[in-house]
């Protein structure tokens, strides 16, 4: 019997899921702004339904399975990725550092999981000059999708294959899963346009923005309608290079219902909706790490072999001058 929880740190909402021996015992959602202003509401929700053997914490861009006791200032910097010279003001997931610190101070049994770029299942050449192949919550979403497809189609984890599109409240992202493993990805800041975020940026636009380019820029310039729909379709099709015969396109995230019909019309694969993917996926990963029912899934993902930092593969001119705070 394992009792675990997972947290999805979204731009719009923080979602929490608790599992007891694989059964859902907690599902709560809080506005991100409210959690940023008072992380205690998140801590209280977890304490009310605890104790937990393990809590899969909010890791932003990801850490290679780091326990709470090992999280220092450098790890916090890598979670949020804010430049040393970034102007002060609201940006990204507001109060993320304070939220993580509050969870750690509450002495919860936390672990902070990897982003896609930390995983050994993605070849190094696909990581070239990339940071965001999918944040830690996208890895969690993919875990839920693997479990979901295996159950629905009555197949083994190693037989699952799909492209997951997460069309969230701000960002859109995509991950390729083949043989039950994450093999490629397009993260929210390097993929299709999102509802509130620009996605992959034209290099010339970045150059011309110059000193005006900030974290707030990445969280701006999004669009709905055809821009969101076609961008998601292009992302899914581009990842079929890495997973040539996906069984399905699985769509998660706040705006998934808005794009299901347009995607089904554009894509030559079955398109299905998956709900509450990131929070439930985080809880599934916690369960597997704690030795529960989802241990084979964690082993298949090679989660314990995650390594490095999100900065390891950046080889651009000027990268040596990157400084975080």
Could you tell me what each predicted segment is?
Residues 127, 131-156, 179-224:
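Glycine-rich phosphate-binding loop plus the immediately following alpha-helix
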Residues 1-70, 105-106:
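N-terminal glycine/serine-rich phosphate-binding loop of ATP-dependent small-molecule kinases
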């Amino acid at each position: 019997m394992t009792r675990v929880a997972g947290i999805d740190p979204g731009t719009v909402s923080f979602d929490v899921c608790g599992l007891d021996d694989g059964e859902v015992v907690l599902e709560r959602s809080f506005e991100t702004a409210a959690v940023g202003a008072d992380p205690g509401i998140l801590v209280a929700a977890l304490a009310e339904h605890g104790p937990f053997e393990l809590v899969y914490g909010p890791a932003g861009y990801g850490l290679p399975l780091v326990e709470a006791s090992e999280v220092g200032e450098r790890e916090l910097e890598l979670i949020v990725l804010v430049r040393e010279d970034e102007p002060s003001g609201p940006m990204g997931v507001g109060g993320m550092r304070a939220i993580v610190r509050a969870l750690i101070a509450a002495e919860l049994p936390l672990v902070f999981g990897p982003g896609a770029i930390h995983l050994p299942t993605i070849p190094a050449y696909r990581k070239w000059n990339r940071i965001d192949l999918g944040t830690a919550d996208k890895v969690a979403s993919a875990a839920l999708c693997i479990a979901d497809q295996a159950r629905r189609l009555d197949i083994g984890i190693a037989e699952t294959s799909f492209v997951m599109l997460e069309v969230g409240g701000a960002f859109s992202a995509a991950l390729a899963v083949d043989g039950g493993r994450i093999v490629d990805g397009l993260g929210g800041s390097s993929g299709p346009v999102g509802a509130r975020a620009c996605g992959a940026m034209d290099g010339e636009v970045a150059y011309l923005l110059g000193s005006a380019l900030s974290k707030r820029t990445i969280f701006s310039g999004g669009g709905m309608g055809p821009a969101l729909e076609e961008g998601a379709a292009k992302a899914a099709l581009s990842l079929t290079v890495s997973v040539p015969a996906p069984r399905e396109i699985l769509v998660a995230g706040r705006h998934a219902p808005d794009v299901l019909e347009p995607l089904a019309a554009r894509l030559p694969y079955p398109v299905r909706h998956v709900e509450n993917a990131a929070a439930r996926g985080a809880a599934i990963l916690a369960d597997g790490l704690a030795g529960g029912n989802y241990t084979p899934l964690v082993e298949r993902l090679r989660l314990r072999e995650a390594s490095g930092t999100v900065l390891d593969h950046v080889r651009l001119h000027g990268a040596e001058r990157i400084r975080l705070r």
